[in-house]
Swiss-Prot record:
Binding site for (R)-pantoate: Q58, Q150
Reactions listed under catalytic activity: (R)-pantoate + beta-alanine + ATP = (R)-pantothenate + AMP + diphosphate + H(+)
Pathway given in the UniProt record: Cofactor biosynthesis; (R)-pantothenate biosynthesis; (R)-pantothenate from (R)-pantoate and beta-alanine: step 1/1
Gene Ontology biological-process entries: pantothenate biosynthetic process
Functional description taken from the UniProt entry: Catalyzes the condensation of pantoate with beta-alanine in an ATP-dependent reaction via a pantoyl-adenylate intermediate.
Enzyme Commission (EC) number: 6.3.2.1
Additional observations: The reaction proceeds by a bi uni uni bi ping pong mechanism.
Enzyme class: ligase
Gene: panC
Gene3D superfamilies linked: HUPs, Pantoate-beta-alanine ligase, C-terminal domain
Statement: the UniProt record of this protein carries the keyword Nucleotide-binding: yes
Binding site for beta-alanine: Q58
GO molecular function: ATP binding; pantoate-beta-alanine ligase activity
Listed name of the protein: Pantothenate synthetase
Length: 273
């Protein structure tokens, strides 16, 4: 496995590759969710590249950039064990300049939900991914459904910038108890992990209601809020697969999303129906 730390090294590696390339962009602190993305990438491509870059432009002032979990040695070992072809681990000063052009996510997709709480976050996501896609030139990119809004915005960029890339949505990976895997779960103690389970349990309740033919989002939201107590709920949202707000559940074209705080840790989860 090649360990690449500069854009020049990545360019050189990519220039020598003629096979189909798959790419898994991450911020490191790799867990079983990331591993599932990498395994699918390896199954569907001849060359697999993984990036582990904690991108500063997608963090707001006061967020956890400095505290964000990092374990470079473990990330490298995981990728080696999975027989990844190259891991890209750049530094921020290698990746950004002061006077570079900016990319803005469309407000219709980025000013709501995560973007309402974290204004500018998705601009930073697109900024880094545009660079990474240009460097890695992948045929396939793999991203988790857990970040459903991000997935939609990235697909919008790929489509509108005429990038010849397939953005593949991968299923959410959960602990045995249902907790969605996240690098930020490391912030939670055992008591907080029990509270965090309220997110997935509220979504399971929503699914059970839909399975019983309930489509009224007000009924579903009320049931979810009851389960989420006493957490501070940021939002519960109901959208279609294009991230347009919906007034009732349409099975096969609906996503229910939830964001809530467990103490100071903000967690997100969703279910695709």
């Amino acid at each position: 496995m090649e360990i690449l730390r500069t854009t020049d090294e990545l360019r050189k590696f990519r220039a020598a590759v003629s096979q189909k390339v798959g790419f898994v962009p991450t911020m490191g602190a790799l867990h079983a969710g990331h591993i599932s993305l990498i395994k699918r990438c390896k199954d569907e491509n001849e060359i697999t590249i993984v990036s582990t870059f904690v991108n500063p432009t997608q963090f707001l002032a006061g967020e956890d950039l400095d505290k964000y979990p990092k374990n470079e040695a473990a990330d490298i070992k995981i990728c080696e064990n999975l027989e990844v072809d190259a891991i890209f681990i750049p530094k921020a000063d290698e990746f950004y300049e002061d006077d570079e052009p900016k990319i803005s996510a469309p407000k219709s997709l980025s000013a709501i939900l995560e973007g309402a709480t974290r204004p500018g976050h998705f601009d930073g996501v697109l900024q880094v991914l545009n660079k990474l896609f240009n460097l890695t030139k992948p045929k396939n990119v793999y991203m988790g459904k857990k970040d459903a809004q991000q997935l939609t915005i990235v697909r919008n960029m790929v489509q509108n910038f005429f990038m010849d890339i397939n953005v593949n949505a991968c299923e959410i990976v959960r602990e045995n108890d249902g907790l969605a895997l996240s690098s930020r779960n490391i912030y939670l103690d055992e008591e907080q992990k029990m509270l965090a389970l309220k997110l997935s349990r509220s979504l399971l309740k929503a699914k059970n209601l839909v399975d019983a033919s309930e489509t009224d989002i007000n009924v579903i939201k009320t049931a979810m809020l009851k389960i989420l107590e006493p957490l501070k709920v940021d939002y519960i949202a109901f959208v279609d697969r294009n991230f347009k707000e919906i007034s009732k559940i349409e099975v096969g074209n609906s996503i229910i999303l939830v964001a809530a705080y467990v103490d100071k840790t903000r967690l997100i989860d969703n279910i695709w129906l």
